[in-house]
Regions:
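Nucleotide-activated chemistry modules centered on ATP-dependent adenylation/adenylyltransferase
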Residues: 1-313
Length: 313
């Protein structure tokens, strides 16, 4: 039996397909429904993607494994584990822990499903030193070696708490990037799966292009343009706004997440990657919405839109 953490996203879907082509064993996909993804509606969309993808994957040429019905478990239903939770508490202030809520329970679940494969991919070429991603860099910095097949090995002076948190998982895609994934999916004749994968972490019906998950894919240039056309345009607008002021890029992200609307008054948002407080008057909201819509209408000729004409400094 092989275990794969499958969200219905591109990376874990690629991993599921690749594994199912290279084994005759049963494969058990597993998915955790976190309160964070449930509250924003993303969990429902990811489960819908799994439901759409699974029968197609099973029917693809070259699939030799039996892929079982996914186990979809709420985080609060995962049994307590004192050893894991104590290690997690001690290491909570480390960035790899505190900034990624999935590790709060994924390693605990991995004790029930040892060797569960995680579809965290390599970074886009040229965006990180030696093409080593943040996850690989973080794990190895604690004295833990990632073997070729993704198995973690605790070295002599390695951090035992970090190993307790991650040690039952296999990070078997840290040297495979999204271009590699697309190329292999194309070679296998699985192009039909790509548009059905759920990359975005919002509850929007289409990929937003401006959340952290979407932005990783957008950094591949035009690679994902045909698969995520609206997301691609949103990303280009956001990048343009960054050249003016980061504040506008953040407000544009909120605008996209609000389906083309901003709220007036006082509100908080983590659209920039950290929680920030905002206050926007109704007049400012109207100006910003007009500006953002004109940028979308004039894409890619942003220079045709003079923000000063709409009262934007």
């Amino acid at each position: 039996m092989k275990y794969i953490y499958w969200s219905g996203g591109l990376d874990s879907t690629y991993l599921l397909c690749k594994t199912a082509r290279n084994t005759t064993e049963e494969i058990q996909p597993i998915y955790i429904i976190f309160p964070e993804t449930r509250s924003r509606g993303a969990a429902d969309l990811e489960i819908n993607a799994q439901n759409d993808l699974l029968p197609l994957i099973r029917a693809e040429d070259g699939i030799t494994a039996t892929i079982l019905k996914p186990i979809q478990i709420k985080e609060e239903e995962i049994p307590h584990d004192i050893e894991f939770e104590s290690a997690y508490e001690r290491m909570y202030n480390e960035d790899i822990i505190s900034k990624h809520y999935m590790y709060r329970s994924l390693g605990k679940l991995a004790k029930q499903y040892p060797g569960i494969m995680i579809g965290i991919e390599a970074p886009p070429p040229g965006t990180r030193e030696n093409n080593i991603g943040k996850t690989e860099n973080a794990i190895t910095s604690y004295g833990i070696k990632i073997e070729e097949d993704g198995t973690l090995i605790l070295e002599e002076n390695g951090n035992k708490d970090i190993y307790t948190i991650f040690g039952n998982m296999k990070f078997c895609m840290v040297h495979i990037n999204a271009i590699d994934e697309l190329n292999e999916l194309h070679e296998w004749g699985y192009d039909d799966l790509i548009p059905l994968c759920r990359t975005c972490c919002t509850a929007l019906p289409q990929q937003c292009g401006v959340c952290s998950n979407c932005e990783i894919k957008m950094r591949y240039g035009d690679t994902f343009k045909k698969y995520m056309p609206k997301a691609y345009v949103n990303y280009q607008v956001k990048q343009y706004l960054r050249t003016i002021e980061e504040k506008y890029a953040t407000l544009y992200t909120i605008f996209v997440w609000g389906s083309g609307h901003l709220n007036s008054g006082k509100f908080t948002s983590n659209a920039s990657g950290q929680v920030e407080n905002f206050y926007l008057s109704t007049n400012t909201v109207n100006k910003l919405e007009t500006w953002f819509n004109l940028l979308l209408d004039n894409y890619p000729n942003f220079d045709k839109v003079n923000r000063a004409d709409y009262g934007i400094e």
